[in-house]
UniProtKB/Swiss-Prot annotation:
Superkingdom of source: Eukaryota
Entry-linked InterPro entries: Rab-GAP-TBC_dom, Rab-GAP_TBC_sf
UniProt organism field: Macaca fascicularis (Crab-eating macaque)
Subunit structure, interactors included: Homodimer. Interacts with ACBD3 and ARFGEF1. Interacts with YWHAB, YWHAE, YWHAG, YWHAH, YWHAQ and YWHAZ.
Record's protein name: TBC1 domain family member 22A
Keyword Phosphoprotein: yes
Gene Ontology MF terms in the entry: 14-3-3 protein binding; GTPase activator activity; protein homodimerization activity
Function summary: May act as a GTPase-activating protein for Rab family protein(s).
Length: 497
């Protein structure tokens, strides 16, 4: 059976709009949501924001790649980075747990970090077993590697906060990063490990479509083989359409198609989804995937995973200031056909790694929510205890985080930036996503601890004020998730007390 997605809401919660709702429902007989919450949210959004500043802290993180590391070195450096970052912004350091907090924007421009290529950092367990000669060699292959976050000032579509870097320095840096991507992608054989390293801190918009196709495993690293692969896979997809799609009205499949048909108009952004051509494309993609994956079939939540791929691939052919306002009316039919096929295959590659999230009873999600609960109890016991005291269960808010990969918690532009990193990480959509969710929850520790009853806590957790988030917020969230991963990676009992 299909499990409910708790409190699903599109678009992500906007505290300015929600203020009206709170006032209109203030006379409910149940415990009211206090009006003070509105002003708190407004003040919270106007006075604070997250940013990963380019400065000396970047040098410390980059230096982590220069040598084989053990867990003590990793944790000491990462903690120092976050502590120094907090002190520069005048933000108090938490006594309980390493949770993320909002901080004021810097008043002065921080220095730009030096450019340079990064080396892979081995996992904690490998750092203990590596020989000195191997760790000192640039050419030494790594059996299990993970990407180090680069300087996170470069953001979605090559844009950033004007207050972080001067426009000239920013343009020069963007151009340099774009050039590195283009050189890697030009081949003749793209170095996928180097591409993952470079992509961790965000992919420039012009090269994002090809980079995603490579990182997802849809296209080969060899440049000469790519056109033939694209042609073959696109032809294969439309053979599925011809063979299966007419069966959508058969008795055995009509319930699946009906549910897809109902769910698509509920998706976000509405300006994109409600275009008839897009609706038809999404219906075909989801129906064909469900028919070809009978172990899970179609489950609510899978539909959301189509959108980022489709938007990224369509933006290769049209100019859109905001990804939420993409208009496909001027895109040739043949181009739309190719984008549809590419979207199907890339979404399929993603779901191959998390399919147990969507099989009967969704055991993958049940397990990950439990793991999140154990992890949060380790990293911030005060937040965990506060939720428990007010009888808020993780399943009531985190089920959606796992089911939709945080797509309903942050704007689409932030989801795309998040997926840049997920596709750069080993098991990014499953394993690393767990640490991102932990960092995301603890990020709101101050607001969580201020709420004193079940209703207000759950309302807040299901409607987090992220409508105005940008890539800086995602970059800091990813940096904290990366630190948590290093702290707990390869520890056999790291989810248990």
């Amino acid at each position: 059976s299909i499990q409910h997605v708790y409190g699903a809401q599109h678009p992500p919660f906007d505290p300015l709009l929600h203020g009206t709702l709170l006032k209109s429902t203030a006379k409910m007989p149940t415990t009211p949501v206090k009006a003070k919450r509105v002003s708190t949210f407004q003040e919270f959004e106007s006075n604070t924001s997250d940013a990963w500043d380019a400065g000396e802290d970047d040098d410390e993180l980059l230096a982590m790649a220069a040598e084989s590391l053990n867990s003590e070195v990793v944790m000491e450096t990462a903690n120092r980075v976050l502590r120094n970052h907090s002190q520069r912004q005048g933000r108090p350091t938490l006594q309980e747990g390493p949770g993320l907090q909002q901080k004021p924007r810097p008043e002065a421009e921080p220095p730009s970090p030096p450019s340079g290529d990064l080396r892979l950092v081995k996992s904690v367990s490998e750092s203990h077993t590596s020989c000195p000669a191997e760790s000192a060699s640039d050419a030494a292959p790594l059996q299990r590697s993970q990407s180090l976050p680069h300087a996170a000032a470069v953001t979605l579509g090559g844009t950033s906060d004007p207050g972080t870097l001067s426009s000239s320095a920013l343009s020069e840096r963007e151009a340099s990063r774009l050039d590195k991507f283009e050189q890697l992608l030009a081949g003749p054989n793209t170095d996928l490990e180097e591409l993952r390293k470079l992509s961790w801190s965000g992919i420039p918009k012009p090269v994002r479509p090809m980079t995603w196709k490579l990182l997802s495993g849809y296209l080969p690293a060899n440049v000469d083989r790519r056109p033939a692969t694209l042609q073959r896979k696109q032809k294969e997809y439309f053979a599925f359409i011809e063979h299966y799609y007419d069966s959508r009205n058969d008795e055995v499949h009509q319930d699946t198609y009906r549910q897809i048909h109902i769910d698509i108009p509920r998706m976000s952004p509405e300006a994109l989804i409600l275009q008839p051509k897009v609706t038809e494309i999404f219906e075909r993609i989801l129906f064909i995937w469900a028919i070809r994956h009978p172990a899970s079939g179609y489950v609510q939540g899978i539909n959301d995973l189509v959108t980022p791929f489709f938007v990224v691939f369509i933006c290769e052919y049209i100019e859109a200031e905001e990804v939420d306002t993409v208009d496909v009316s001027g895109v040739p039919a043949e181009v739309l056909r190719n984008i549809e096929a590419d979207t199907y295959w890339c979404m399929s590659k993603l779901l191959d790694g998390i399919q147990d999230n969507y099989t009967f009873a969704q055991p993958g999600i049940q397990m990950k929510v439990k793991m999140l609960e154990e992890l949060v109890s380790r990293i911030d016991e005060q937040v965990h205890r506060h939720l428990d005291q007010h009888e808020v269960r993780y399943l009531q808010f985190a089920f959606r985080w796992m089911n939709n990969l945080l797509m309903r918690e942050v704007p689409l532009r932030c989801t795309i930036r998040l997926w840049d990193t997920y596709q750069s990480e080993p098991e990014g959509f499953s394993h690393f996503h767990l640490y991102v969710c932990a960092a995301f929850l603890v990020r709101w520790r101050k607001e969580i601890l201020e709420e004193k009853d079940f209703q207000e806590l759950l309302l807040f957790l299901q409607n987090l004020p992220t409508a105005h988030w940008d890539d800086e917020d995602i970059s800091l969230l990813l940096a904290e998730a990366y630190r948590l991963k290093f702290a707990f990676a390869d520890a056999p009992n790291h989810y248990k007390k």
